Amino acid sequence: TPSATQTAETAEAVARTLTPRKNGELVLRLQAAALRTRENAIVPPNLLFLAGGNASVRGYGYQQIGVESSDGVTEAGRYLLAGSLEYRRPVWRNGRATDWDSVVFVDAGNVANTPAGLRHLRYGVGAGAIWRSPVGPVELAAAYGVQERKLRLHMNLGFTF
């Protein structure tokens, strides 16, 4: 029986700030991952991928995006694609920047067992605030999962990307 040791995993994550800080910044994040095996290989679920949540596709629950089984259960898949486009703008008061940023974003992603299955992206859109605290950023955002038609609150402590 083929085993999980006969696998190849590829994962890439990229985050880039595209504009200067003074007037705001445009941040782009992209994640892509693939697990290639022989078709009949037995792969432990912890080697597969799920998406959704604070550091993935906001507007969806943590690891809620996956491959839907025939009985409607979300399962991990062999391919992952996720990304985010985020605009952060400093909050100004009396002509000076404060320790706060406002943020708006669009996230997209999917998990599938074939590369072609990644085409059906799930989208999340939202807005929030980031406090640049002395110990690191604290973010609170509201995100709407477009396909799920549900609003979720997300809180991050520290850098997500």
Regions found by a protein language model. Give the residues of each.
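Small/polar glycine-rich anion-binding or flexible loop at a beta-alpha turn
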Residues: S102-D107, H120-G124
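Conserved active-site loop/cleft motifs that coordinate metal ions or position small ligands
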Residues: S102-F105, V138-A143
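Short beta-alpha junctions and helix-cap segments that line functional grooves
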Residues: T114-A116, V125-A127, L140-A143, R152-L153
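C-terminal structured "cap/appendage" subdomains that terminate the fold
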Residues: L118-G136
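Conserved short loop/turn motifs at secondary-structure junctions
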Residues: T1-P2, A143-V146
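A generic beta-sheet turn/junction motif
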Residues: T19-N23, W131-V135, V146-E148
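C-terminal outer-membrane beta-barrel translocator/porin domains of Gram-negative envelope proteins
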Residues: T1-W100, V104-F105, A112-T114, L153-F159
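Outer-membrane beta-barrel "beta-signal"
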Residues: A129-S133, R149-F161
